[in-house]
């Protein structure tokens, strides 16, 4: 059990759940000044103003946190990340500055193809080590749940390697992690002249092996057949 008291500002509080918030309502965030928050069994047990706090009746296994001059708010949920990757593509930033389009960079072997090449040579241990550093960084910045995509493998074996890494990361961090199989992130070089065969490979081989939690197709102009992604 945890009691957080003397909270300067408790952010995003609602007496009753809301299905969604849209339009002008998004400008308003419900807050309580000088608040308390009780947590029991990892769930919020109660909250309110310190002026209305009834005090503590059961001190058993209770941890008290004084949050004077501090703000308490929900953690962030990052629903789109590529935390697992090998190396960077900073050289392509110069290409973009010089006016090259993503498609032009891709045709030269850059973009996702560049990342796939780097990932091919990286070990699972190397990928885990670098990804853990990134996860720790976003956790310190307030993220509590994160989605991680594959998609830099572009082959069944490499995509499986990425998904194994993501699975292992779940056990190495307190963050909630959801995995997404993004095998159709780009078309590998060997399938550039027969793109439909790559889509068939994803559907017939990869999906049959139930890779990841979800199959998603990314539509990029000139990189995919639109009709093949529906």
Describe the function of each predicted region.
Residues 1-4:
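Extreme N-terminal starter segment of soluble prokaryotic enzymes
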Residues 62-129:
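Metal-associated gating/positioning segment near the N- to mid-region
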Residues 115-130, 136, 144-230:
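Metal-coordinating catalytic core of metallo-dependent amide/deamination hydrolases
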Residues 14, 83-90, 157, 224:
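Short, function-defining helix-loop hinge/capping sites that tune catalysis or transport
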Residues 13-72:
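Histidine-rich, glycine-flanked metal-binding segment
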Residues 8-12:
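Conserved beta1/A-loop at the N-terminus of ABC ATPase nucleotide-binding domains
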Residues 7, 37, 42, 69, ...:
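Divalent metal-coordination and catalytic microenvironments
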């Amino acid at each position: 059990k945890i009691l957080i008291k003397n909270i300067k500002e408790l952010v995003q509080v609602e007496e009753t759940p809301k299905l969604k918030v849209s339009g002008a309502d998004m400008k308003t965030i419900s807050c309580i000044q000088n608040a308390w928050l009780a947590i029991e069994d990892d769930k919020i047990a109660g909250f309110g103003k310190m002026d209305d706090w009834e005090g503590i009746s059961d001190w058993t296994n209770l941890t008290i946190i004084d949050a004077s001059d501090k703000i308490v708010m929900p953690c962030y949920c990052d629903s789109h990340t590529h935390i697992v990757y090998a190396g960077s593509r900073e050289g392509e930033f110069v290409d973009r500055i010089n006016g090259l389009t993503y498609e032009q960079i891709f045709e030269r072997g850059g973009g996702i193809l560049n990342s796939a090449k780097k990932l091919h040579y990286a070990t699972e241990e190397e990928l885990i080590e670098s990804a853990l550093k990134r996860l720790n960084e976003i956790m310190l910045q307030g993220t509590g749940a994160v989605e991680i995509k594959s998609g830099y493998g572009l082959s069944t074996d490499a995509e499986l390697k990425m998904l194994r890494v993501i699975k292992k990361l779940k056990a190495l961090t307190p963050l909630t992690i959801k995995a997404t199989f993004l095998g159709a992130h780009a078309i590998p070089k060997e399938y550039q002249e027969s793109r439909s065969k790559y889509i068939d490979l994803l559907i017939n081989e990869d999906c049959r092996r139930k890779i990841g939690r979800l199959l998603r197709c990314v539509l990029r102009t000139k990189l995919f057949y639109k009709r093949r992604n529906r």
